Amino acid sequence: MRHVWKTLLLVTFFFNKGIANDCVPYRIDDDVIACVCNATYCDGLPDGRPEVPEEGNSYWYVTNKQGLRMKMSEVKFDSCENFPVDVTLTIDNTKKYQTIFGFGGAFTDSTGINIAKLSPATQLQLIRAYYDPKEGSRYTLGRIPIGASDFSERQYTYDDTPNDTTLKHFILANEDFDYKLLYARKALEFNSEIRFFSAAWTAPLWMKSNDNGLTFLKEEYYQVYADYLLKFLDEYKNNGIDIWAITTGNEPLTASIFKLPNISMGWEPETMANWIANNLGPTLASSPYNETLIFAFDDNRQVLPRFVEPTFRNQDAKKYVAGTAVHWYQDSKTPADVLDQTHDEFPDKLIFMTEASVIGPPIWNTSKVKLESWHRGERYILSIIEYMNHWSIGWVDWNLALDETGGPNNINNNIDAPIIVNPKTDEFYKQPMYYATKHFSRFVDRGSVRISITDNDTIKSAAFVTPSAENVVVLYNRATSPRHVVLKDVQKGTLCLELSPQSMNTLKYK
């Protein structure tokens, strides 16, 4: 039977300076844990210690299936006497790769709907858990849908008046003011370094063909739709949110396969390239938003690099596009080598992972949340490691928060989320997925550069050097037993670590 441990003594004890606020566990059984947060308490990292340890030491943060959550200790370099070795990994920070831009999640309508059901104090705790650079995950990215997504209670765009080619009736929705803008601005209060990017699920219905339920933008509305997106940038700026980047639209392949005419829109690779070259690109370039980046594609990687080749081989389109946005769905069926191929073919273009979530059981099963699932947290951290090691500049989760059914969703496509909201008790639950992203986002600052580290089938790894010349190493032990790991830094020395079973580990040293 589910029960919550909320001992007040824990709350008092762990507010001591320099000691992390420990997880108050919500348990189903002994090895399945989420962490409970409410208006007065939420686990977080300590705020009374130096950012990096003294020379010769490393901070070591551990989250594991047994219940540790970001548990911090110090380990000394070159203290390996009589240490048994299972795995040796070598770091070389002279071998550098891509620069990291950040990590984040999406301010969907559903996220806002769920946050709004909490008390004001608990709302701030939730936003702090993600965006506070001191105690939270230090997220620096936020994705904002342009109009409705499936994670809205209704299907809408900003101009549903047929044939309004001058966009006279363009207007933001109540959902923008009540949910998206409101909480995006609150996040900015915690961290002014947040950059927001946006994608539309669809153009207004009257701009599209809808033959047999499959939906594409009509060519006569190519410029009107570019103007529509420009108006969105205007309205959000007028309401305090600058948009750093937009994509060419959410999941154009999905709209070419599934009949969801009201909340999807397909593109063919060649027509997308032409629209960028002749409409979207010039429209943004001649506007006050000429520094707003454009990312093409925004879909699953199984058709890369083929889908973006027409865009990047069309010089009139290529000059406007910063890179390729990609989602994680179907990754198990498509090796990450396609990201390397895309990078190798177009090395001057960025790769950016913009959506991940755990969908769970089939679509007709409405119960998609598996509270406290370690396996789902494992999927997250392995995905982040993989994308970092294959040229992505960031990794962005989908909904920041959902309810205990994984909704609301207007097509019954409920899913899981790193934070689950319980308005009845004015609480939210931080799942293992939350800590998986935090093991990266809290330590890998914007401007960090990925560096070389050897890999292993059991111990998955990624390594970075930050703009402050700190080294950050993330390790995941996939084994169900401890592993003794020797971490050799060519410049710094050797760390000897006993990694607990199924554990997430972040090391930080100067």
Residues covered by each model-derived region:
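N-terminal catalytic cores of secreted or lumenal carbohydrate-active enzymes
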Residues: K65-W244, T248, I263-E270, N274, ...
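Short linear sequence signals and composition-biased patches located at protein termini or domain-edge surfaces
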Residues: H3, L182-Y183, P501-N505
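Short, conserved phosphate-binding/catalytic loop or strand-edge motifs used
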Residues: G249-A255
